[in-house]
Amino acid sequence: MKRLLSSFFIFLLAISTLPARTYIVSVGIADYPGRQNDLRVSANDAKTISGIFTKNGNATVDCFVNSDVTIKKVCTAMRNTFAKASPSDAVILYFSGHGVPGGLVCYDGFLYYSSVLSIMRQSKAQQKMIFVDACFAGKMRNTNKRNTNYSKENVMFFLSSRSTEKSLETPRQTGFKNSLFTVFLERGLRGGADTNKDRVITAKEIYNFVHQGVVEASGNRQHPVMWGKFDGNMPVIKW
């Protein structure tokens, strides 16, 4: 009887420590209207990140690329997907494409971070994350708009570059199918960033891994930045 009670207790403990569900909207644009603004791998970046969380098996993933990445579709996807989250869950927006000060360049115009955060605030999830792989991504803090002190938001921002830097696409000859930031983000989320080998990648671990890899691979030309109001030990993924 004691053995049965002990086994039952262990079973309940295991249930209580199961990872919370992650709700992610992953979008990328390589093919912008016209030809001058096209990128090479941004659409694949979004597919790569969505694939990681889909394979994880504990995530609800929305992924769309190129002409599907309109302001309306992105906002609708975030509202519908993030609304499903409970307080113990996490919500994530991943974007790869062009950036502007204070926002993202969708297929049909600019989606400002203020709009993204407005939607995120409506979610019950306690863990909220934004990953952006775009040139001058860090410039989002340097807008002229009022009331844009995003560092006070309960959101982790992980941005591919400083405000004055370009986010590099990997050269064709390297064989990589992702931009430099997402190359290391993928490696980190698949276990490379798990320094203490506990099968959980935290915000601090993914930052350290990606930052070091990108800075070294770019020859000190690109420096990912992470900021916001969050716990550095916040789990990003259980792999």
Language-model features, listed with the residues they occupy:
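Cysteine endopeptidase catalytic domains of the caspase/legumain-like
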Residues: 2-7, 16-239
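Repetitive helical segments and hydrophobic/amphipathic motifs
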Residues: 11-12
